[in-house]
Every structure is written in C-alpha cells, then in structure tokens.
C-alpha cells in the first residue's frame, strides 16, 4: 500500500461515515463494463460541490489492491451487481489529486516531474524485484511492472484540469501537460481504466485533442452517467422525508439541472447543508464566491448583459456551445462565456432546445450579488428597489407600482421593448424580491386563457396574498382586471384559498407611460 499507488479506502470511508451519504456506487457498474475495452477512458466534468472527489475516492476504494473493501461496499447498490466481486480490489490503482501536486509545484513542468517521481517511488516500494529499464521514467516503470507482474493499472486523476485554471495563459505549458497525459495513458496495454474528473471538458488545441481517446461526460451531455452528476429527485425526496424538510422549497432552491430521460439533478453539497442545518438558504457562496461569476459578467460581450438580465427574470436564452475552447481565458463571443457558465454550474443547459437558464434560486441569488457589485449600477438599483415595489402591490398603491415599472423599463431600455413578453421581462426584474415570498409562474395555464404572471405564496408565508398580473400593450388598463375575471385566471389557483390581488399593467407606446390598477378579491367557497 502506497500513497498514490494502491492507497487504502480511508477517504471513501469518511464520506460513508458522514451524516449524509447518498449511494452512488451504481457508477461502478458502468466503469466495470468498460474495463479493458476501447471505452476504458472516462472524463467526467462538473462544477465544484458536485461530488467529483467523492466519486474518485469511491473508485479508488473499489479497485485498489491496497484495500479490502468488501464489507465497506456490501450494503450499497454495487454489491448486487454480478461483477461486484470480480473486480473488487483487483487492480494496481494510481489515484492522484492533481490540485494537490500543483499546489506544491511552481510550474507545470515541475508538476509533471513531481507526479512522475511520486508514482515511481510507490512502484519501486511495491515491486522492488522488478527489473526497471529506466527508473526515472514513469511510463517505462509502469510498462515494466505490467509485463513482469501481469498486473494492469487503473489510473484515477482528480482535478485533472487544475492547470488550466491556474495557468490560464501559458499555452505551451498546457500542451506539454496534455502530451504527458497522452503518453502515460493512450494506447497503453497496462491501462485497463483511466478515470479523470475536472470542471472543464478536455482542452482542445490546434486541429486535435491530445486526449481524443476519452469519452466525455459533462454538464452539457452527461449521457448514461446523468444520475451520478448530483442528487436525483427521488434521492432528495427521501432526504426531505428523513429530515422533515419541504420538498417544494428544496426543489425551488437547489434543483434545476435537467438532462435526457427527464432526469432532474439537485446541487448535492447544498442539499446536504440544507438537511444538516434544517434551513433553506444560500450555501453556494460558502464554497464559491460571487467574484468568480462577476468576472465573467463584467466582460459584457455584446448581448451578454441582455442574456443575464433575461435569465434573472426567469427566461431561457439560446446558446451556441460549438465554438468554446474548453478553457477559462479564450472568449470571443457571449456564447463562449455562457458555455463556460454551463460547466461552472451557473446556468443549466437544455440539450434539445439549445438554451440555458439560471437553474434555481440559490444560483439566482449569486447573479443578483454579482450584478449589484458589477458595473451595471443602473440595473442593480432596480433589483434593490424591488422590495419596495412588492410592498406597494401589497398596500395597493398602483401609482408607485407604475413608477417602479417605468424606472425598471428605463434601466433596461436596451432590451427590445415591443410586446407583452418584453413587458413581462421588465416586471419580473421590478418584482425580483417577490421570489423570497412566492413561487412564480409565467403564463400559468388556467380558465379560458392564461395569466402573464402568477405569484403563489410559499408555504411558510401563508399570510401573503396571491398575485395575478395581466399585462397589456396599448390597451385599456381597466380592461386588464376585467380580462382576468372574464378569463377566470384564478381557477389556476384551485388549491389556494385566501386573498388575491389582481394587478393590471398597460404600456402606452405613444405616451411611453405605464399604468397600473390593483383590485383585491378572495378565493374561498366561490372562485373569482
């Protein structure tokens, strides 16, 4: 048993022994299925807080010949798999967190040298009787062990892409690193599985990728590994039952990463913190400050500002992911920034529609923090004033509401403002603070038509009135309230009982004036 060659299972044991551990050992069934095949190269990229290192430690505990992990895995899903015992602790396993190596190195070249020396030292301790052709060359040493001992290798590289975050501009050193990994891993009989984790997909340079033998599983397309990206809906429901938390609130705050086959993924670190502390809140910024997001927002490529504001308002925006360079420094268009934000977890990607959105309220709060501290001062003012606008609706002060919407329109005047959708967008920003008290639905189906915006009080704020908003464009503002009643919008609130505020808003293009009317009604034994 060494430090990097055939380590013990202690790191995975820590995860299993924690207050909350969600069984993700089903991943091993997939890795077992590709052992010693052309599909043995796996690169998994996902954001921080999404359990990459835990998965790497799990693979280490399962494959490492330095472990006796049968009992450790016996109560988990993988133990039911027919191949469970066949591969359990049967491989020479090299497991390295590249960030740890980088932190003790002063350059990428030193990282490569240190990695080689550390692995070679463990190899020579484990196999002192091997006739090493060149005991300074890690590739030669691994080949010698394989040929003389008939022991194949599983190589697990956690945070493999750290150098692209630390050395963003050093292209020559990046290529050297990629070439080194290729030389160690590609077309080598001694490799039966290579598993790498990172935040970014594999870096491309020139006309090819040095690591083009890898299958990539990312936040854009996790493929068959989607359920292992984070916590699934079923897993979170079980935790909510165990810890007596409201699944609706948890879903609103931490869900939002959706993949094929309708797999919905929650942010695991945030869910765990929420359960442990029994409190809905923003746990994202405890591991990732909004400064990281602010850097990219302040780039403000043409169209980026519009996209960010639209997403804060709850919309989706189209994105072309095809030109992204898979690094954190090469940006030519807004799409490059948005694609990076997909990989960082700041937006979720819909593979079918090719659009992105802010996944949940926790992440949305980070956008508001970033915008408030950015150079977009005029926009942040509208967001900060949104609490006053909401209060004005509660107090039925339509003139103040109309003035606030006018101000929000002025501050986002670069947005094409020519239909009800644009008006809805502006009002969503003007009422951003409502997200603290309401579940917001846009174009909620109901009655004979649909309402533009419906605000349903969250369970913990039952004293707040529901709000139904009808948006008009060059129409009679009083007719908006009548239309709400005529179309029976409030039938959409069938399970709601209590006060409801009917809000009509109209924008007159000729006078450029916003008008607002507010009426109160009650949903009880009779429906509005």
Where are these regions (language model features)?
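Phosphate-binding site recognition
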Residues: 1-417, 434-437
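Short, well-ordered amphipathic alpha-helices
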Residues: 59-63, 178-182, 453-456, 484-490
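Structural motif
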Residues: 154, 465-469, 501
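Acidic, low-complexity intrinsically disordered tails
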Residues: 379, 462, 504, 511-515, ...
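Short secondary-structure junctions
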Residues: 431-439, 495-497
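Nucleic-acid nuclease catalytic cores
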Residues: 477-481, 488-518
């Amino acid at each position: 048993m060494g430090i990097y060659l055939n380590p013990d299972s202690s790191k995975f044991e820590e995860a299993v022994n924690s207050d909350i551990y969600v069984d993700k050992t089903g991943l091993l069934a997939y890795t077992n299925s590709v052992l010693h095949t052309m599909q043995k190269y796996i690169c998994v990229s996902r954001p921080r807080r999404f359990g990459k290192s835990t998965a790497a430690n799990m693979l280490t505990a399962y494959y490492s010949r330095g472990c006796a992990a049968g009992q450790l895995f016996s109560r988990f899903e993988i133990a039911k798999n027919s191949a469970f015992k066949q591969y359990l602790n049967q491989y020479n396993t090299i497991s390295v967190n590249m960030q740890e190596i980088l932190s003790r190195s002063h350059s990428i070249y030193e990282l490569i040298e240190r990695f080689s020396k550390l692995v070679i030292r463990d190899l020579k301790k484990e196999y002192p009787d091997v006739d090493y052709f060149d005991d300074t060359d890690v590739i030669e040493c691994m080949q010698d062990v394989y040929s003389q001992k008939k022991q194949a290798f599983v190589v697990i590289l956690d945070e493999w892409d750290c150098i692209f975050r630390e050395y963003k501009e050093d292209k020559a050193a990046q290529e050297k690193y990629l070439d080194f990994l290729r030389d160690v891993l590609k077309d080598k009989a001694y490799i039966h599985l290579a598993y790498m984790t990172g935040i970014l997909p594999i870096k491309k340079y020139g006309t090819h990728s040095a690591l083009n033998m890898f299958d990539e599983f990312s936040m854009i397309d996790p493929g068959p590994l989607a359920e292992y990206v984070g916590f699934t809906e079923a897993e979170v429901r079980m935790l909510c039952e165990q810890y007596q938390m409201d699944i609706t609130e948890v879903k609103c705050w931490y869900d939002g990463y959706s993949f094929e086959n309708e797999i919905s993924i929650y942010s695991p670190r945030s869910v765990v913190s929420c359960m442990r502390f029994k409190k809905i809140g923003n746990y994202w910024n405890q591991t990732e400050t909004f400064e990281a997001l602010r850097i990219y927002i302040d780039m403000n490529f043409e169209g980026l500002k519009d996209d960010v504001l639209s997403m804060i308002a709850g919309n989706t925006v189209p994105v072309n992911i095809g030109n992204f360079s898979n690094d954190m420094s090469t940006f030519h268009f807004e799409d490059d920034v948005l694609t990076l934000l997909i990989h960082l977890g700041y937006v979720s990607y819909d593979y079918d529609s090719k659009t992105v959105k802010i996944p949940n309220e926790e992440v949305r709060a980070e956008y508001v923090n970033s915008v408030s501290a950015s150079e977009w001062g005029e926009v942040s003012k509208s967001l900060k004033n949104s609490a006053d606008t909401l209060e004005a609706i509660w107090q039925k002060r339509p003139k103040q509401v109309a003035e606030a919407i006018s101000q929000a329109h002025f501050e986002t005047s670069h947005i094409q403002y020519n239909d009800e959708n644009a008006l809805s967008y502006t009002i969503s920003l003007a009422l951003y603070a409502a997200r603290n008290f309401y579940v917001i639905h846009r174009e909620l189906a109901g009655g004979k038509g649909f309402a533009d915006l419906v605000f349903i009080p969250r369970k913990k704020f039952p004293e707040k009135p529901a709000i139904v908003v009808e948006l008009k464009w060059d129409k009679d503002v009083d007719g908006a309230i009548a239309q709400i009643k005529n179309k029976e919008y409030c039938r959409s609130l069938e399970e709601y009982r209590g006060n409801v505020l009917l809000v009509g808003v109209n924008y007159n293009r000729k006078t450029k004036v916003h008008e607002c009317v507010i009426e109160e009604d009650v949903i009880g034994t009779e429906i509005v």
